[in-house]
Amino acid sequence: MTFTKQPPAVHDTDISFPQPHVLVVTLNRPKAFNAIPRPLHPQLAALWAWYDAEPSLRCAVLTGAGKAFCAGADLKEWNDKAAAGQAIGAAGERDPSWATSGFGGLSNRRGKKPVIAAVNGLCLGGGMEMALAADMIVAAAAARFGLPEVKIGVVAVAGALPRLTRIVGRQRASEMALLGRTYAAEEMRSWGVVNHIVPEGGSVVDEALRWAGELAGNSPDSVIVTRAGLLGGWDPVDPVKSTQEIDEGIYKLLEAGENQKEGVKSFVEKRRPVWKDSKL
Protein backbone atom coordinates (compact mmCIF):
# COMPACT_ATOMS: atom_id res chain seq x y z
CA MET A 1 0.00 0.00 0.00
CA THR A 2 1.05 3.60 -0.60
CA PHE A 3 0.83 6.00 2.32
CA THR A 4 1.11 9.75 2.67
CA LYS A 5 3.64 9.09 5.44
CA GLN A 6 5.36 5.84 6.43
CA PRO A 7 4.32 4.21 9.73
CA PRO A 8 6.56 4.85 12.74
CA ALA A 9 8.94 2.16 13.97
CA VAL A 10 7.51 0.06 16.80
CA HIS A 11 9.69 -2.48 18.58
CA ASP A 12 8.47 -6.04 19.21
CA THR A 13 5.44 -5.39 17.03
CA ASP A 14 4.55 -6.59 13.54
CA ILE A 15 2.65 -4.20 11.29
CA SER A 16 0.89 -5.54 8.20
CA PHE A 17 -1.76 -4.60 5.66
CA PRO A 18 -3.35 -7.91 4.59
CA GLN A 19 -6.25 -6.33 2.75
CA PRO A 20 -7.19 -2.90 1.41
CA HIS A 21 -7.72 -0.16 4.01
CA VAL A 22 -6.92 -2.45 6.97
CA LEU A 23 -4.00 -2.24 9.40
CA VAL A 24 -3.07 -5.28 11.53
CA VAL A 25 -0.94 -4.70 14.63
CA THR A 26 0.52 -7.86 16.18
CA LEU A 27 2.27 -7.64 19.54
CA ASN A 28 5.28 -9.93 19.14
CA ARG A 29 6.77 -10.88 22.49
CA PRO A 30 5.32 -14.40 22.72
CA LYS A 31 7.81 -15.64 25.32
CA ALA A 32 6.65 -12.82 27.59
CA PHE A 33 2.98 -13.39 26.70
CA ASN A 34 3.17 -10.07 24.84
CA ALA A 35 3.61 -8.10 28.06
CA ILE A 36 4.35 -4.49 27.15
CA PRO A 37 7.50 -2.79 28.49
CA ARG A 38 7.49 0.95 29.15
CA PRO A 39 9.30 2.14 26.00
CA LEU A 40 6.68 0.45 23.83
CA HIS A 41 3.71 2.52 25.08
CA PRO A 42 4.63 5.82 23.36
CA GLN A 43 5.70 3.93 20.23
CA LEU A 44 2.29 2.27 20.00
CA ALA A 45 0.61 5.62 20.72
CA ALA A 46 2.49 7.08 17.75
CA LEU A 47 1.34 4.18 15.58
CA TRP A 48 -2.34 4.71 16.47
CA ALA A 49 -1.95 8.44 15.78
CA TRP A 50 -0.41 7.60 12.39
CA TYR A 51 -3.32 5.24 11.66
CA ASP A 52 -5.85 7.97 12.43
CA ALA A 53 -4.01 10.42 10.17
CA GLU A 54 -3.51 8.06 7.21
CA PRO A 55 -6.43 8.60 4.77
CA SER A 56 -6.16 5.19 3.10
CA LEU A 57 -6.73 3.23 6.33
CA ARG A 58 -10.24 2.64 7.64
CA CYS A 59 -10.00 -0.08 10.27
CA ALA A 60 -7.30 -1.62 12.48
CA VAL A 61 -7.02 -5.04 14.09
CA LEU A 62 -4.93 -5.61 17.23
CA THR A 63 -3.79 -9.11 18.18
CA GLY A 64 -0.88 -10.97 19.78
CA ALA A 65 1.62 -13.56 18.65
CA GLY A 66 1.62 -16.98 20.28
CA LYS A 67 -0.71 -18.00 23.10
CA ALA A 68 -1.49 -14.54 24.45
CA PHE A 69 -3.19 -11.37 23.28
CA CYS A 70 -1.41 -9.37 25.98
CA ALA A 71 -0.69 -10.30 29.60
CA GLY A 72 -0.37 -6.65 30.64
CA ALA A 73 2.68 -4.81 31.92
CA ASP A 74 6.14 -6.34 31.91
CA LEU A 75 6.37 -7.11 35.63
CA LYS A 76 9.91 -8.42 35.32
CA GLU A 77 10.88 -4.95 34.12
CA TRP A 78 9.03 -3.43 37.09
CA ASN A 79 10.80 -5.77 39.52
CA ASP A 80 14.21 -4.97 38.04
CA LYS A 81 13.47 -1.24 38.40
CA ALA A 82 12.39 -1.68 42.01
CA ALA A 83 15.54 -3.67 42.80
CA ALA A 84 17.58 -0.78 41.38
CA GLY A 85 15.70 1.70 43.58
CA GLN A 86 13.80 3.24 40.68
CA ALA A 87 10.10 4.10 40.47
CA ILE A 88 7.89 1.27 39.28
CA GLY A 89 4.32 1.18 38.06
CA ALA A 90 2.52 3.33 35.58
CA ALA A 91 4.10 6.60 36.66
CA GLY A 92 7.73 5.56 36.44
CA GLU A 93 9.44 7.09 33.40
CA ARG A 94 6.02 7.73 31.87
CA ASP A 95 5.59 9.43 28.54
CA PRO A 96 3.56 12.66 28.87
CA SER A 97 0.95 11.25 26.47
CA TRP A 98 0.05 8.42 28.89
CA ALA A 99 -3.12 10.06 30.23
CA THR A 100 -4.61 10.56 26.76
CA SER A 101 -3.26 7.41 25.08
CA GLY A 102 -2.86 4.98 27.95
CA PHE A 103 -1.67 1.38 27.99
CA GLY A 104 -0.33 0.31 24.62
CA GLY A 105 -1.27 3.75 23.34
CA LEU A 106 -4.84 2.48 23.23
CA SER A 107 -6.56 2.15 26.60
CA ASN A 108 -7.29 5.89 26.87
CA ARG A 109 -7.29 6.59 23.15
CA ARG A 110 -10.32 8.31 21.73
CA GLY A 111 -9.06 8.57 18.17
CA LYS A 112 -11.30 8.80 15.14
CA LYS A 113 -11.08 5.36 13.49
CA PRO A 114 -12.18 1.97 14.83
CA VAL A 115 -9.99 -0.76 16.28
CA ILE A 116 -11.04 -4.41 16.51
CA ALA A 117 -9.36 -6.51 19.20
CA ALA A 118 -8.67 -10.05 17.95
CA VAL A 119 -8.14 -11.74 21.32
CA ASN A 120 -6.29 -14.95 20.58
CA GLY A 121 -5.43 -16.04 24.13
CA LEU A 122 -4.61 -14.53 27.52
CA CYS A 123 -6.03 -11.02 27.87
CA LEU A 124 -5.05 -9.79 31.32
CA GLY A 125 -4.34 -6.52 33.09
CA GLY A 126 -3.25 -3.92 30.56
CA GLY A 127 -4.25 -6.31 27.79
CA MET A 128 -7.79 -6.24 29.15
CA GLU A 129 -7.61 -2.45 29.38
CA MET A 130 -6.72 -2.27 25.68
CA ALA A 131 -9.45 -4.72 24.70
CA LEU A 132 -12.09 -2.73 26.60
CA ALA A 133 -11.03 0.39 24.69
CA ALA A 134 -11.41 -1.36 21.33
CA ASP A 135 -14.60 -0.77 19.36
CA MET A 136 -15.30 -4.49 18.97
CA ILE A 137 -13.82 -7.71 20.36
CA VAL A 138 -13.54 -10.98 18.44
CA ALA A 139 -12.20 -13.71 20.72
CA ALA A 140 -10.91 -17.25 20.41
CA ALA A 141 -12.97 -19.81 22.31
CA ALA A 142 -9.95 -20.52 24.53
CA ALA A 143 -9.25 -16.86 25.36
CA ARG A 144 -9.17 -15.83 29.01
CA PHE A 145 -9.95 -12.35 30.32
CA GLY A 146 -9.25 -10.64 33.62
CA LEU A 147 -7.95 -7.77 35.72
CA PRO A 148 -5.72 -9.57 38.25
CA GLU A 149 -3.91 -6.42 39.43
CA VAL A 150 -5.15 -6.66 43.03
CA LYS A 151 -3.42 -10.03 43.36
CA ILE A 152 -0.02 -8.44 42.74
CA GLY A 153 -0.46 -5.12 44.51
CA VAL A 154 -1.06 -2.86 41.52
CA VAL A 155 -4.13 -1.19 40.01
CA ALA A 156 -5.83 -1.13 36.59
CA VAL A 157 -5.32 2.60 36.26
CA ALA A 158 -5.32 2.95 32.47
CA GLY A 159 -9.04 3.50 31.91
CA ALA A 160 -10.51 0.01 32.30
CA LEU A 161 -12.34 0.47 35.59
CA PRO A 162 -14.90 3.11 34.55
CA ARG A 163 -15.36 1.45 31.15
CA LEU A 164 -15.86 -2.02 32.61
CA THR A 165 -18.46 -0.65 35.02
CA ARG A 166 -20.41 0.88 32.13
CA ILE A 167 -20.32 -2.33 30.11
CA VAL A 168 -21.14 -4.94 32.75
CA GLY A 169 -22.50 -2.96 35.72
CA ARG A 170 -20.92 -2.24 39.07
CA GLN A 171 -21.48 -5.66 40.64
CA ARG A 172 -19.88 -7.68 37.86
CA ALA A 173 -17.10 -5.11 37.47
CA SER A 174 -16.44 -5.37 41.21
CA GLU A 175 -16.33 -9.16 40.96
CA MET A 176 -13.70 -9.03 38.24
CA ALA A 177 -11.58 -6.14 39.52
CA LEU A 178 -11.75 -6.64 43.31
CA LEU A 179 -11.43 -10.44 43.30
CA GLY A 180 -8.94 -10.52 40.44
CA ARG A 181 -10.62 -13.49 38.77
CA THR A 182 -10.19 -14.58 35.16
CA TYR A 183 -13.06 -15.51 32.86
CA ALA A 184 -13.70 -17.58 29.76
CA ALA A 185 -14.59 -15.96 26.45
CA GLU A 186 -18.13 -17.32 26.57
CA GLU A 187 -18.79 -15.66 29.93
CA MET A 188 -17.40 -12.39 28.62
CA ARG A 189 -19.75 -12.66 25.66
CA SER A 190 -22.70 -13.20 28.01
CA TRP A 191 -21.61 -10.11 29.96
CA GLY A 192 -21.54 -8.02 26.79
CA VAL A 193 -17.75 -7.60 26.66
CA VAL A 194 -17.07 -9.85 23.64
CA ASN A 195 -18.91 -9.47 20.32
CA HIS A 196 -18.10 -12.80 18.72
CA ILE A 197 -16.37 -16.07 19.62
CA VAL A 198 -14.39 -18.08 17.08
CA PRO A 199 -14.81 -21.83 17.66
CA GLU A 200 -11.79 -23.98 18.47
CA GLY A 201 -9.73 -24.59 15.35
CA GLY A 202 -10.75 -21.32 13.71
CA SER A 203 -8.55 -18.27 13.21
CA VAL A 204 -9.51 -15.30 15.34
CA VAL A 205 -7.45 -12.97 13.14
CA ASP A 206 -9.14 -14.22 9.96
CA GLU A 207 -12.54 -13.63 11.55
CA ALA A 208 -11.52 -10.16 12.74
CA LEU A 209 -10.32 -9.40 9.21
CA ARG A 210 -13.74 -10.36 7.86
CA TRP A 211 -15.30 -7.86 10.25
CA ALA A 212 -12.68 -5.26 9.33
CA GLY A 213 -13.30 -5.81 5.62
CA GLU A 214 -17.03 -5.33 6.10
CA LEU A 215 -16.41 -2.14 8.05
CA ALA A 216 -13.89 -0.86 5.49
CA GLY A 217 -16.53 -1.31 2.79
CA ASN A 218 -18.70 1.33 4.43
CA SER A 219 -18.36 5.08 3.96
CA PRO A 220 -15.19 6.09 5.86
CA ASP A 221 -16.72 9.47 6.68
CA SER A 222 -19.90 7.88 8.02
CA VAL A 223 -17.87 5.43 10.10
CA ILE A 224 -15.79 8.22 11.66
CA VAL A 225 -18.79 10.40 12.49
CA THR A 226 -20.91 7.47 13.70
CA ARG A 227 -18.08 6.32 15.95
CA ALA A 228 -17.78 9.84 17.38
CA GLY A 229 -21.50 9.75 18.16
CA LEU A 230 -21.15 6.36 19.86
CA LEU A 231 -18.29 7.65 21.98
CA GLY A 232 -20.46 10.56 23.06
CA GLY A 233 -22.73 8.08 24.80
CA TRP A 234 -19.89 5.84 25.91
CA ASP A 235 -17.84 8.52 27.69
CA PRO A 236 -20.37 10.99 29.19
CA VAL A 237 -17.89 11.40 32.03
CA ASP A 238 -14.47 11.25 30.42
CA PRO A 239 -12.52 8.16 31.57
CA VAL A 240 -9.34 10.12 30.85
CA LYS A 241 -10.32 12.67 33.52
CA SER A 242 -11.36 9.87 35.87
CA THR A 243 -8.04 8.12 35.31
CA GLN A 244 -6.07 11.34 35.85
CA GLU A 245 -7.83 12.03 39.16
CA ILE A 246 -6.86 8.60 40.49
CA ASP A 247 -3.46 8.61 38.83
CA GLU A 248 -2.43 11.99 40.22
CA GLY A 249 -3.86 11.34 43.67
CA ILE A 250 -4.14 8.08 45.57
CA TYR A 251 -2.23 6.04 42.98
CA LYS A 252 0.97 7.95 43.77
CA LEU A 253 0.63 6.82 47.39
CA LEU A 254 0.22 3.23 46.25
CA GLU A 255 3.37 3.47 44.11
CA ALA A 256 5.37 4.82 47.03
CA GLY A 257 4.22 2.03 49.35
CA GLU A 258 5.61 -1.42 50.07
CA ASN A 259 2.76 -3.53 48.75
CA GLN A 260 3.22 -2.74 45.07
CA LYS A 261 6.91 -3.65 45.24
CA GLU A 262 6.08 -6.84 47.14
CA GLY A 263 3.35 -7.81 44.69
CA VAL A 264 5.56 -7.41 41.65
CA LYS A 265 8.52 -9.12 43.35
CA SER A 266 6.42 -12.10 44.47
CA PHE A 267 5.01 -12.50 40.96
CA VAL A 268 8.51 -12.63 39.45
CA GLU A 269 9.68 -15.00 42.21
CA LYS A 270 6.56 -17.19 41.71
CA ARG A 271 5.45 -17.12 45.34
CA ARG A 272 2.50 -15.84 47.31
CA PRO A 273 2.79 -12.15 48.28
CA VAL A 274 3.07 -11.13 51.91
CA TRP A 275 1.01 -7.96 52.22
CA LYS A 276 1.52 -5.13 54.72
CA ASP A 277 -1.40 -3.28 56.29
CA SER A 278 -2.50 -0.43 54.05
CA LYS A 279 -1.27 3.09 54.81
CA LEU A 280 -3.32 4.81 52.10
Curated annotation (Swiss-Prot):
Q: What is this protein called?
A: Mevalonyl-coenzyme A hydratase SIDH
Keyword Aminoacyl-tRNA synthetase in annotation:
no
One of its Pfam families is: ECH_1
Q: Which UniProt keywords apply?
A: Isomerase, Lyase, Peroxisome, Virulence
GO terms for biological process, alphabetical:
fatty acid beta-oxidation
Q: Which GO terms describe its cellular component?
A: mitochondrion; peroxisome
Describe the task this protein carries out.
Mevalonyl-coenzyme A hydratase; part of the gene cluster that mediates the biosynthesis of at least 11 siderophores, including beauverichelin A, dimerumic acid (DA), Na-dimethyl coprogen (NADC), eleutherazine B, ferricrocin (FC), fusarinine A, fusarinine C (FsC), metachelin A, mevalonolactone, rhodotorulic acid (RA) and tenellin. This cocktail of siderophores for iron metabolism is essential for virulence, and more specifically for the fungal virulence in penetrating through the host cuticle. Siderophore synthesis is also involved in conidial germination under iron-deficient conditions.
Q: Does the keyword Lyase apply?
A: yes
Q: What is seen without this gene?
A: Does not affect conidial germination, sensitivity to oxidative stress and iron-starvation, nor virulence.
Q: Where in the cell is it found?
A: Peroxisome
Give the location of motif PTS1-type peroxisomal targeting signal in residue numbers: 278-280
